[in-house]
């Protein structure tokens, strides 16, 4: 009996062990299945190859003085290109990896390319990257929202609320292909549409030169350009005035307000630089028409995306019709990229936001240049006051996008020529409707551009000698400072 009982107990024990073993195996198998399913769902398929290509190109070394892009290549002749992306060097650098500085190269202080923000986006490479499928939004329109992304509109309203630079609640938002298209759409919407009494487009001197160039280029019988708003301040006979107010102003960074106060006068506010990295945000702007662009906001000039905030429904409708007939909406890829970048900024780390990075960079550049010019008796810069900023909750130092430099000597009436003799290429004052004793110098370029500018200005001021150099007119390329 004892042996039978022992055998029975062993059998039961064996069954228990087998049962436990089977359960363990079953659990392990289930876990493995879930892991396999998870890894399978995370595994890249069609996006794997373009992702690898993007990583490979981004890793190309350009000695810190240039960038390689997927679509960059060295053209050997019209029908043949060298294989693979190559480095595109910053101004005054050359070589296969941009390793050679060209000391005699003129400083590029003309361009308004906002490349000062490039380091921020490189630091946020993962969160700002995006992959676009070959079949992404092939239609002309978004479902139920026409030519404009509803999600992007919502993000723009959210961004303005965070920064506190514009009232958007109860306002219409319309997209355009950069700032240039929006300016003309707004002028068209506000014009009298009367060939016998055309509207006059008037900015305040110094003004952003694109206003004049574009208005004259697209000039219709319904409107024409006039140089100075101050000439029309006391004119009550003219009822069709459209004042373009740039605030902060390009080129001098001043916070302008409309001068024309007649009931029939209209104003378009260029708010492209009304962001906390360029100026103090004192209150939300609440103008009838306010224009903004992605290039001035986050640096992506090549995306060609801008937007207008409009109060009046009739004006909004006329602008919308103009933009629809002009380009049938804005590129869906541009809207997608704008949306992606907007999310990065909204969800940004508090310790290093784009606004912090941008403000520190521009403030430091202005301080360095101003410190050098302030000791000169030959040159001066515009005066910009310290102001309280509601976004940063503190009094902030100036950080303008451009330096508006003036030659102080009576005999030096062509300041552009004076700087050109010192290998510094800026934009003439007359380009902005002002005297040629002024020159606009861009501060928004690469760090290489700014360092080179600072070096040449130091040399020029250290000499402080009369200079009667007279150079040929060097035009400021329109597309270099949009």
At which residue positions do the language-model features occur?
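Immunoglobulin-superfamily Ig-like beta-sandwich domains in protein ectodomains
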Residues: 65-67, 72-73, 230-236
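Short helix-capping and inter-helix turn/linker motifs at the boundaries of alpha-helical repeat units
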Residues: 57, 75-79, 394
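Onset and early core of a folded interaction/catalytic domain in large eukaryotic regulators
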Residues: 58-59, 73, 95
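PLP-dependent class I/II
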Residues: 2-32, 86-88, 97, 101-482
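Extracellular cysteine-rich, disulfide-stabilized repeat modules
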Residues: 68-70, 75-92
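Disulfide-braced loops of extracellular cysteine-rich modules
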Residues: 55-65
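Ser/Thr/Pro/Gly-rich low-complexity linker/stalk segments immediately outside membranes or between
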Residues: 28-57
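Short, 15-30-residue, compositionally biased linear elements
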Residues: 51-52, 82, 415-417
